[in-house]
Amino acid sequence: MCAPLEKDDIRRLSQAFHRFGIVTVTELIEPHTRKLVRAEADRLLDQYAERRDLRLATTDYTRRSMSVVPSETIAANSELVTGLYAHRELLAPLEAIAGERLHPCPKADEEFLITRQEQRGDTHGWHWGDFSFALIWVLQAPPIDVGGLLQCVPHTTWDKASPQINRYLVENPIDTYHFESGDVYFLRTDTTLHRTIPLREDTTRIILNMTWAGERDLSRKLAADDRWWDNAEVSAARAIKD
């Protein structure tokens, strides 16, 4: 499933992760495993995809336009994804990179998410994650000139009552990343403001997100009604009509 990494590789990845909030770990995952995950995501999208088009109050009304397969649907219908999520062969190197233990996500609706951006303008707008760590499998990526690139501002914090996203964008550099189909990256989601650049034309960008918690997350109280991927009718969401 996973290819072993040398100590020097782990050290290099860990240093980059703590500096930039993100590292590419494609070399950690065997190509055969990545192909299996791609086929599994396609199957789940074909059977269970739900469309979302909304703006979210807790991130200054940034946009969410994509199709999704929610976490609990994935958990109930994919032994492959749930098995990978709990596999020590995957968790051990990620924990070495993070420098701490990765705990199963304490909220079942946030363990997993499959998204498919497919229409011109589709985007996952500026946001943070409620929990500390995510492994993102880029299963299908558009060409670099079409959009869908990842942008990040590390070492930021999320105040849901006053996100101040534009202030962060003005006061900090924005790092931009292009990934090819099959790439995998590890992201510090709670302190890295991030988004995907909107698609310039109809095309396809598919990812699988696996989320883990840090020790600090286990006692957190999440009061905001903003879990849009699980329910498009949450109170923090404003539907996009156009």
From Swiss-Prot:
Top-tier EC class: oxidoreductase
Matching InterPro entries, A to Z?
Answer: BesD, BesD/HalB-like
Cofactor(s) needed, names only, are: Fe(2+)
Q: Which Gene Ontology MF annotations are present?
A: L-lysine 4-chlorinase activity
- What is the deletion mutant like? Cells lacking this gene no longer produce detectable amounts of L-propargylglycine and L-beta-ethynylserine, that are terminal alkyne-containing amino acids produced by wild-type S.cattleya.
**Per UniProt, what is one Pfam family of this protein?**
HalD
Q: Does the keyword Ribonucleoprotein apply?
A: no
List the catalytic activities from the record.
L-lysine + chloride + 2-oxoglutarate + O2 + H(+) = 4-chloro-L-lysine + succinate + CO2 + H2O
What is this protein's record name? L-lysine 4-chlorinase
Q: What this chain does, per the record?
A: Involved in the biosynthesis of terminal alkyne-containing amino acids such as L-propargylglycine (Pra) and L-beta-ethynylserine, that are produced as antibiotics by S.cattleya. Catalyzes the chlorination of L-lysine at the C4 position, leading to the production of 4-chloro-L-lysine.
Supply the gene name: besD
Family (UniProt): Belongs to the alpha-ketoglutarate/Fe-dependent halogenase family.
